[in-house]
């Protein structure tokens, strides 16, 4: 047989087998379509992509692939293969969050990105946007990837709140979304109170200190936040009321900053504001004008006088203005103490000097006058050796002075008392004589003044007579000369003379 005959005999058999496979009941239309699709792709020479060939379908792994176990989990993964017993609800929730974070990380880094199977039911796509290089930046894959990243960020924040030691994936980067909060300043209720100065502090030190403690940024925004005439950047919150703007990454930082700021939004009286006093002290330290104590306290060579009221012991008022003086019982106590003092002085001096506190001032004046007269009239004191010459005769005056002088008498003796009474009587007589002499001098002065007044009156009368004679002479002069203008007032052509008297 020739080779051609052999080929002709083999062809029918192959066609028969092919027809049998097609007509067999085990093959469906879908299987047939997929079979022919694979045959065409293989015949074209294009290999299957990574998305088309699943990792689990591979029989051979490359050295870059991660070895898989029977349960499909990598041996290097931190996920538990089986849950240990005795876990709390928080631990189970943290484990579920970790599983979801790892799943999203795997989709973002390795893929594939899941698409919605129902394309007709999905929302319409947004208009396309392009970057500087002309590439589209909001493709469907990019939008799904951003959505997964946002979900992973929320899961990481929740996991860190449950377990502070949780470490996010290595490729995780938190978004730059800042949290803000407004705290309005009550400037309308207290327009004269300096809230901004208390919050900012000297050269911004108070503001910087609060930012360091809380970790949030503190700024003053709104109407009145900038000085008049100072160029500032236009802010979108300029038309808002005056407020404090807090900006932070977390809510805890905002809460800490709010507590620190609200302490300065409560008005305090001027003398009780300790925070303002500390700010002024800090500013003085910066300017170099701080004094630890007043200047007058340094070189003071005197001590203040500690004057207290005699009756109540207070330093707020003198004894004369004490409110306890109007009290009757207290007044009686003062009088009794005064009387005790007078009695003690009378015993020590040997004679009675009792003067009640309510006595008139006339007695005190008489005592002072008597003392002055005693000092002026020395002939009645030590010069005369205590003798009284009013009742002495001529023979008595020639006698020698007595042996006993004033200094030799006892204070309690009757001679001493008689001498004191005689001396007081002499002083009174001298006072009367002096008063009479002064009265005579006053009368003489009055008479002289009256004489002077009479002389002045006589001089004035003489001046008036001279002036009248002068006017009469001028009148006769004008009458004789027949002046067309007539005599002026007073008779003089230049008017009446000036009275210089």
Curated annotation (Swiss-Prot):
Q: Which UniProt keywords apply?
A: Metal-binding, mRNA processing, mRNA splicing, Nucleus, RNA-binding, Zinc, Zinc-finger
| Zinc finger extent (CCHC-type) | 307-324
> Known Pfam families for this protein?
KH-I_KHDC4-BBP (PF22675), SF1-HH (PF16275)
Q: Where is the composition biased (Low complexity)?
A: 15-27, 362-392, 410-484
Which molecular function terms from Gene Ontology are attached? mRNA binding; RNA binding; zinc ion binding
UniProt feature, compositional bias: Polar residues: 1-14
* Signal peptide annotation: none
Q: What is this protein called?
A: Branchpoint-bridging protein
What organism does the record attribute this protein to? Dictyostelium discoideum (Social amoeba)
